[in-house]
A protein has these predicted regions:
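N-terminal phosphate/diphosphate-binding loop that engages ATP/GTP or pyrophosphate donors
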Residues: 27-81
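Conserved lysine of the Walker
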Residues: 18
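Hydrophobic anchor at the beta1->P-loop junction of P-loop NTPases
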Residues: 10
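P-loop (Walker A) phosphate-binding loop of NTP-binding proteins
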Residues: 13
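Hydrophobic positions on the alpha1 helix immediately C-terminal to the Walker A/P-loop
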Residues: 21, 25
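Walker A (P-loop) ATP-phosphate-binding motif of ABC ATPase nucleotide-binding domains
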Residues: 7
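Phosphate-binding/switch loop-helix module in NTP-utilizing enzymes
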Residues: 77-131
Length: 195
């Protein structure tokens, strides 16, 4: 008996379009399904990346929702450092974790962008993600390209109910339709099982 795929992970090199793909899929399905979650948006000033913002998926696609700085090169004096960025742990708590906890109760599709080194610095983030993955919800998540180097991430990606897609410059134009189709089929299956 095959396991129903309801968790879709997208990985790929930085800048390849993971967040864009997730936003496009969420936007295409937003009026048909209850969608909640968050994205991590790169912020540039004068062509140079200065940090990342966390925002609700609804905010990311032009509707209302919370946002805050996840990390910045100079804005924060305290907090853990990853590369040149200081990470704002309170944004992970106030936006990512809070949204995921709400989404488990209310959403059909839960968007998690990204499961990566910055987000994993918060001790509650991984247990919250595991709670989401162990729910019956459909999940569309991006995972850091180096997930294989972290046993915690590798365990998430290798679940029998998960499908991993690696986004590249060569396949990214076709991958949107493939991911959208798979997510929509999982959502239809979820809806049928709840009827």
């Amino acid at each position: 008996m095959s396991t129903r795929r309801r968790i879709f992970f997208v990985t790929g090199r930085p800048g390849v379009g993971k967040t864009t793909l997730v936003k496009r899929v969420a936007e295409a399905l937003f009026d048909k399904y209850r969608i909640d979650g968050f994205i991590t948006q790169e912020v540039r000033e004068g062509g140079t990346r200065v940090g990342f913002k966390l925002m609700s998926i609804s905010k990311a696609i032009g509707r209302e929702g919370p946002e805050d700085w996840l990390a910045h090169v100079s804005m924060f004096r305290d907090g853990p450092r990853i590369g040149k960025y200081r990470v704002n742990l309170s944004a992970i708590e106030d936006i990512a974790i809070r949204i995921l906890e709400r989404a488990v109760a209310e959403a059909d599709l839960i968007v998690i962008d990204e499961i990566g080194p910055m987000e994993l610095l918060h001790r509650k983030f991984l247990p919250t993600v595991e709670k989401v993955l162990n729910s019956d919800k459909v999940v569309l998540a991006t995972v850091h390209i180096r997930y294989r180097e972290d046993d915690r991430l590798r365990r998430l990606v290798e679940r029998p109910d998960a499908l991993l897609v690696e986004l590249t410059v060569q396949n990214r134009n076709n991958m949107y339709q493939i991911v959208k189709h798979n997510v929509e089929q999982a959502l239809k299956s979820l809806r049928r099982s709840m009827a």
